Every structure is written in C-alpha cells, then in structure tokens.
UniProtKB/Swiss-Prot annotation:
Protein name (database record): Putative protein LomR
Coiled coil: none
Pfam families registered for this protein in UniProt: Ail_Lom
Cellular component terms per the entry's GO annotation: host outer membrane
Family the UniProt entry places it in: Belongs to the outer membrane OOP (TC 1.B.6) superfamily. Ail family.
Taxonomy, superkingdom: Bacteria
Note, other: This protein is encoded on Rac prophage.
Length: 51
C-alpha cells in the first residue's frame, strides 16, 4: 500500500481585540492511495474468531 498526502492553507488574519479575530483561509489538498488485489480485510468477532 502506498500513500501520498499534501496540503497547503494560506490566508490573512486580523486580531481586533482580545475577544475578536477575523481570518480567511484558502487551501488545496492532494491525496493518492494505491493498493494491490492481494489486500484483504479479515472480519472477526469480539473473541478473535473469523466469521
């Protein structure tokens, strides 16, 4: 399994006083996952036995 992840967020921030702040954010994200057909999920009960 491979995983790539990339994220960027930028934006201005203004603090007016101790109780009020204003900000605007813009972002971009990239993700990629690859796997192969041999991957599987084994389902078990709460005692560890396969169902």
């Amino acid at each position: 399994m491979r995983n790539r992840w990339f994220s960027v967020m930028v934006g201005p921030s203004v603090r007016v006083n101790e109780w009020f702040s204003a900000y605007a954010m813009a972002g971009m994200a990239y993700s990629r996952v690859s796997t192969f057909s041999g991957d599987y999920l084994r389902v078990t009960d709460n005692k560890g036995r396969c169902e």
